[in-house]
A protein has these predicted regions:
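Structural preference for solvent-exposed beta-strand-turn elements
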Residues: 1-414
Length: 414
């Protein structure tokens, strides 16, 4: 599906979808609880549906109380031998350790761009925790068979924190205590979200500055009443739209959130946008924007939003952390460079771990999403400033995280 975004200004108030990162963690914790939990404020993007499908396959009984509320009776009693994670990297790395709690073989399958994303970092740690793994050269599909044991192991945290999240949620139910020695942990705010979610279900996880995690075995997940907060990754795109093309207020978000992408507000301030923070909303509005420097190592999902912000700013912006982008839905560093070049914006990624973006006039262009939801949204925001229209090929991929993005953007056009 192609989507065309013409030059225009925006003004209005929007509520983003719920945090899919929190939603998937809460769904997993509800599965691991042997009683009934209630999750509120859920909205169903593709990734959240994948997680819901996973917990049902692994034994959860789910009742839809209303359009945004689920009652979930947990318990690991697999109903099948195949766990289909869709195109969700988090669901893959989260539910593989959880499936390894079972004493039966479970095959993890995916689709689309996920089949090109490496999963090798899970294989050796799982084997050292007693899981039998039938490998596929580090890619999906593969088979795991538990039970997963505790122990003391090293885990590489330099590529992603998602597998560590899966271990942290699964290992409290193992028979033995576990110490994880984590090398070069990245995206540490996401680990904070995991520890927070576990705590809200009565499970304790301790860590030493993300270098060591201690997980006591034999714990029990307790039922929770869990309200999912708004998604800061989605909010970031909307706030950048306000900063470059008018004024946008985003509701149901708080700067006190543990979500990594609250950091977008720091970038907006550095770019000299006007930012107002209220108790449950944030507003960003346009002022003449200047080039900025920002380190996105621990919030790599912000890169596409930061690219749109930098393209609208005067001067050369410097964004660090590009090493985190290779194994997303696409190689995001390459995609940002290629697609923004079509719109006349120079993006330099020749320096290791650094992206330089020279802001300027954004030209009318026809660009590709690369099957990446955040790239599609980034180019749409840039389209608000182009000298004609920005046409995005493959725009349907926004359904992965924010199905109503283009409709919401249209609502606030003036």
């Amino acid at each position: 599906m192609d989507k065309t975004v013409p030059l225009g200004r925006v003004k209005g108030t929007l509520t983003p979808p719920c945090s899919k990162s929190y939603a998937q963690r809460a769904l997993a914790a509800s599965l691991l609880c042997g009683e009934t939990s209630v999750l509120r404020n859920l909205e169903f993007c593709d990734d959240t549906r994948s997680a819901l499908r996973c917990i049902e396959t692994l034994g959860a009984r789910v009742k839809h109380v209303d359009a945004s509320t689920l009652s979930i009776e947990g318990g690991l009693h697999p109903r099948g031998k195949v766990l289909h994670v869709g195109e969700s990297g988090l669901a893959t790395r989260l539910f593989t350790p959880i499936a390894s709690l079972c004493g039966m073989p479970v095959t993890i399958e995916g689709q689309g761009t996920l089949l090109r994303r490496p999963m090798h970092m899970m294989i050796d740690p799982l084997r050292r925790l007693g899981v039998r793994v039938r490998d596929n050269d580090g890619y999906l599909p593969f088979e795991v068979r538990g039970p997963i044991r505790g122990g003391e192991i090293d885990v590489d945290g330099s590529v992603s924190s998602q597998f560590i999240t899966g271990l942290l949620l699964a290992l409290p139910l193992s028979q033995h205590d576990t110490t994880l020695h984590v090398r070069s942990a990245v995206s540490t705010p996401y680990l904070d979200m995991t520890v927070d979610t576990a705590a809200r279900f009565g499970v304790e996880i301790c860590h030493n500055d993300y270098k060591e995690f201690y997980i006591e075995g034999g714990q029990r997940y307790r039922p929770a009443f869990f309200s999912i907060e708004g998604d800061w990754s989605a909010a970031a795109m909307l706030l950048v739209a306000g900063a470059v093309a008018g004024e946008v207020t985003v509701k149901n978000v708080s700067m006190l959130s543990k979500q990594a992408d609250t950091a977008i507000c720091t970038a907006l301030v550095r770019a000299r946008a006007a930012v107002i923070n209220d108790e449950d909303s944030v507003t960003a509005s346009h002022r003449p924007l200047r080039a900025f420097e920002f380190d996105a190592t621990h919030c790599p999902d912000l890169f596409p939003a930061l690219a749109a912000l930098a393209a609208a700013a005067q001067g050369e912006s410097v964004i660090r952390g590009t090493s985190r982008l290779e194994h997303k839905e696409c190689n995001r560093a390459d995609a940002i460079r290629e697609e923004y070049a079509k719109a006349g914006i120079e993006v330099d990624t020749s320096q290791e771990d650094v992206m330089r973006i020279r802001g300027g006039r954004i030209r009318q262009a026809r660009v590709q999403s690369h099957g990446d939801h955040r790239m599609a949204m980034s180019m749409a925001v840039a389209g608000l400033l182009c000298d004609g229209e920005m046409t995005i090929e493959g725009a349907e991929c926004v359904a992965k995280s924010y199905p109503g993005f283009f409709e919401d953007l249209e609502k606030i056009r003036i």
